[in-house]
UniProtKB/Swiss-Prot annotation:
Gene name per UniProt: rpo1C
Entry-linked PANTHER family: DNA-DIRECTED RNA POLYMERASE (PTHR19376), DNA-DIRECTED RNA POLYMERASE III SUBUNIT RPC1 (PTHR19376:SF32)
The keyword Nuclease belongs to this UniProt entry's keyword annotation: no
GO biological process: DNA-templated transcription
Protein name listed in UniProt: DNA-directed RNA polymerase subunit Rpo1C
Catalytic activity: RNA(n) + a ribonucleoside 5'-triphosphate = RNA(n+1) + diphosphate
Length: 393
C-alpha cells in the first residue's frame, strides 16, 4: 500500500521527468507504480523504477541517420518469405473462409479496394449480447436474403404465363422469413397486373395478366428471384459465435455503414478487414490504425514477431497524403520526387522520357539516386556534415 507521503514523492519525481518521456508513457508509468500491491516501496525503489523506465525508453529510440526504411523493408519482408500461401477456414466455422499469410499481406500493402474474403466481427449492446436468441435475430436481420436464397425450385409455365415458386421449409426457418412476408414484397414490385394463388403451405403461383412474350416472362422470373427480402447489402452470411461471456456475429462480407444503422449493434466495437470501407466511413486515421492492426494480425497468426514500429511506418507511408496508397508503382514508389528512383523501380524508359519531356530536375536527396551515380548517401555517418579548419601555421 502506498501512503500519502510516498504518493507526494512519486508525483514530484514524475513531474521532474515530464519532458523526458511521452505523455502516454508518463501516465502509464504513474498508473503502474500506483497499482503495485503487496510490496512496501521506498523512495529509493521509486527512483530505481523511474530511472530504469527512462533508460529503457531512451534505448528504444533510433539513432539520428538510421536507415529506417531499409530496416523496415527487411523486418517485414524477411518474415514474409516464411508465410503460407493458403486460404484457411475461419476457426470453428465451416462456411467461412479467411485469407491469411502472404496473400493477405499482399492485399494490404497493395491497398486492394475489396479484400478477397471481406469479414466483420460485430459486437452487440448489453441488451442483446448475452441472449443467444436475440443475437440470432440480429444475425437474421443483417444477412442479405433474396427470394432465390429460400426457394427450392422455380417453374415457368409459358402456356398460362405464370411462375410457380416452391419454398424450402428449412431455409425459411433458418433465415427467419415467412411466406406472407415474401408475398407482400412481390406485390409491391413493378410487375404489372398479377394474381397470386396458393398451391400449398410452402408454394404459390404468380399469374401475369398482361404479359404475352416468353422473354418478358423470364425477365420477371429473374426480377423476382433477385428481389431483396431483408438484410444489409454485401453481407452474404452471418453466424453467431460465443466469445467469452457474450455472443458476437461473424459475417461473410462487409458493409460498415449499413451495419452501424442496425439496432442492437455496438457501433463502438465493430471490426472489419475492409480498409477502404473504414476510410470512407470513419476517415484516414481509422484506416491507418486498421492497416497496422491487420499487418500485425497476419504476422502473429504465422507465429512471426515484428516490432510494431516497423508496421506503423508502413501504415504511415501508405496514408500520409490523406488517401490510402499502395506500396508500388501506382502508389508510394511511383510518386517519388526523384526521377532516377522512379526509373530504378519499374518501366525505366517511360519514367526517363516523361521526366525529360516535363523538364524535371534531379535533386539527389534520396538513397537510390545517390547510389546510382556513386556518391555517398545521406544516411548514417553520411548525414553528418563536418568542416575542418586547417592549421594555418
Amino acid at each position: 500500500m502506498i501512503d500519502e507521503k510516498l504518493k507526494g514523492y512519486i508525483d514530484k519525481r514524475l513531474n521532474e521527468i515530464k519532458d523526458k518521456i511521452p505523455d502516454k508513457l508518463h501516465e502509464d508509468l504513474r498508473a503502474a507504480i500506483m497499482d503495485i500491491n503487496g510490496v512496501e516501496l521506498t523512495e529509493e525503489d521509486i527512483d530505481r523504477i523511474i530511472d530504469l523506465t527512462i533508460r529503457e525508453y531512451q534505448q528504444s529510440l533510433i539513432e539520428p541517420g538510421e536507415a529506417i526504411g531499409v530496416v523496415t523493408a527487411q523486418s517485414v519482408g524477411e518474415p514474409g518469405t516464411q508465410m503460407t500461401l493458403r486460404t484457411f477456414h475461419f476457426a470453428g466455422i465451416r462456411e467461412l473462409n479467411v485469407t491469411l499469410g502472404l496473400p493477405r499481406l499482399i492485399e494490404i500493402v497493395d491497398a486492394r479496394k475489396v479484400p478477397s474474403t471481406p469479414m466483420m466481427t460485430i459486437y452487440l449492446t448489453d441488451e442483446y449480447k448475452t441472449d443467444k436468441d436475440k443475437a440470432l435475430d440480429i444475425a437474421r436481420r443483417i444477412e442479405y436474403t433474396r427470394v432465390e436464397n429460400v426457394v427450392s425450385s422455380v417453374s415457368v409455365d409459358i402456356s398460362n404465363m405464370s411462375i410457380t415458386l416452391q419454398f424450402d421449409q428449412e431455409m425459411l426457418k433458418d433465415k427467419g422469413v415467412s411466406i406472407e412476408e415474401i408475398k407482400k414484397i412481390i406485390t409491391k414490385l413493378k410487375l404489372g397486373e398479377i394474381r397470386i394463388e396458393d398451391n400449398d403451405e410452402y408454394s404459390f403461383t404468380i399469374y401475369f395478366e398482361k404479359i404475352d412474350s416468353i422473354m418478358a416472362l423470364f425477365k420477371m422470373r429473374e426480377k423476382i428471384l433477385n428481389t431483396k427480402i431483408k438484410g444489409v447489402k454485401g453481407i452474404k452470411r452471418a453466424i453467431v459465435q460465443k466469445k467469452g461471456d457474450e455472443y458476437v456475429i461473424i459475417t461473410d462480407g462487409s458493409n460498415l455503414e449499413g451495419i452501424m444503422n442496425v439496432t442492437g449493434v455496438d457501433i463502438n466495437k465493430i471490426q472489419t478487414n475492409n480498409i477502404h470501407e473504414v476510410e470512407e466511413v470513419l476517415g484516414i486515421e481509422a484506416a491507418r490504425e486498421l492497416i497496422s492492426r491487420e499487418i500485425k494480425k497476419v504476422l502473429e497468426e504465422q507465429g512471426l514477431d515484428v516490432d510494431m514500429r516497423h508496421i506503423v511506418l508502413v501504415s504511415d507511408i501508405m496514408t500520409r497524403t490523406g488517401d490510402i496508397r499502395q506500396i508500388g508503382r501506382h502508389g508510394v514508389t511511383g510518386e517519388k520526387s526523384s526521377v532516377l528512383a522512379r526509373a530504378a523501380f519499374e518501366v525505366t524508359v517511360k519514367h526517363l522520357l516523361d521526366a525529360a519531356a516535363r523538364g524535371e530536375r534531379e535533386e539527389f536527396k534520396g538513397v537510390i539516386e545517390n547510389i546510382i551515380i556513386g556518391q555517398p548517401i545521406r544516411l548514417g555517418t553520411g548525414i553528418v556534415e563536418l568542416t575542418m579548419k586547417p592549421n594555418m601555421r
